């Protein structure tokens, strides 16, 4: 925990070069789910020097509280985990962790949050409310946000507003965008298993083709979603299909 007295002007504004360095440093050390030791250490290396209370309310979560003595606090949330993806970009700051990559922009999100923390430190005396910056793990997987919500942090620090953000490459440089209501979709992941009966393809009539059943399910589900696309903004897609063990044997089990 780091507790410092507010001292506006004693801390330098972050530069674009600083933010670029943060992003590239973090891009090289992608970690997934709650297993984020290097990422957490990097976040601490920046915010521990600032006039804020630094604490970890739950597993792999780092918070920085800039106290203005107000009963009102604005929270800013960034995600910190990467994806189980192999990077092949060839850039000088490419991932050094095999099989892991910041492919969804969380390195950029963290860089912006660290830059914001330094900006707040430089202008702390000018704020009329406190600020809590939250570095959240497991956004891509098991739901790190739930543990933060259940920790009592938002109640303890009187959070009455919270903002998240996401990089959007289609926006012009220097622009941000929002809209009333829902903006980004929540996701639910499902696994479907189809059971059949394996037989030699020459005797296909004696078997039950789980692969055909799975493919028909996908096509009919896609057709159904297309028919109701005008009713609500939602989508259904399958990204993985595993079936069969031999070319000449009817598949007895299919996973989607």
Question: Where do the language-model regions lie?
Answer:
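Acidic/His- and Gly-rich active-site-bordering loop/insert found
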Residues: 2-102, 107, 111, 115-127
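Histidine/acidic-residue-rich, glycine-tolerant segments that coordinate divalent metal ions
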Residues: 83, 91-101, 108, 125-252
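Polar low-complexity intrinsically disordered regions
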Residues: 1-6, 10, 17, 177, ...
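A glycine- and small/hydrophobic-rich beta-loop-beta segment
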Residues: 255
């Amino acid at each position: 925990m780091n507790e410092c007295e507010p001292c506006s002007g004693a801390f330098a504004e972050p530069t674009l070069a600083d933010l670029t360095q943060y992003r590239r440093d973090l891009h090289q050390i992608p970690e997934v789910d709650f297993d984020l030791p290097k990422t957490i250490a990097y976040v601490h290396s920046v915010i521990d020097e600032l006039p804020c209370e630094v604490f970890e309310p739950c597993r792999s979560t780092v918070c920085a509280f800039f106290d203005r003595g107000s009963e009102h606090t604005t929270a800013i949330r960034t995600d910190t985990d990467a994806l189980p993806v192999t990077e092949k970009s060839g850039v000088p700051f490419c991932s050094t962790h095999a099989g892991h990559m910041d492919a969804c922009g969380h390195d950029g999100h963290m860089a912006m949050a660290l830059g914001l923390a330094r900006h707040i430190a430089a202008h702390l005396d000018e704020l009329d409310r406190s600020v809590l910056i939250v570095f959240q793990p497991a956004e891509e997987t098991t739901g790190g946000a739930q543990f933060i919500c259940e920790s009592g942090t938002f109640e303890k620090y009187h959070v009455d507003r919270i903002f998240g953000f996401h990089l959007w490459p289609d926006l012009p440089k220097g622009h941000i965008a929002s809209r009333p209501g829902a903006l980004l979709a929540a996701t639910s992941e499902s696994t479907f298993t189809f059971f059949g009966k394996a037989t030699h393809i020459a005797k296909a009539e004696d078997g039950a083709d789980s692969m055909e059943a799975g493919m028909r399910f996908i096509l009919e589900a896609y057709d159904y979603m297309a028919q109701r696309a005008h009713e609500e903004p939602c989508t259904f897609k399958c990204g993985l299909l595993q079936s069969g063990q031999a070319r000449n044997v009817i598949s007895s089990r299919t996973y989607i």
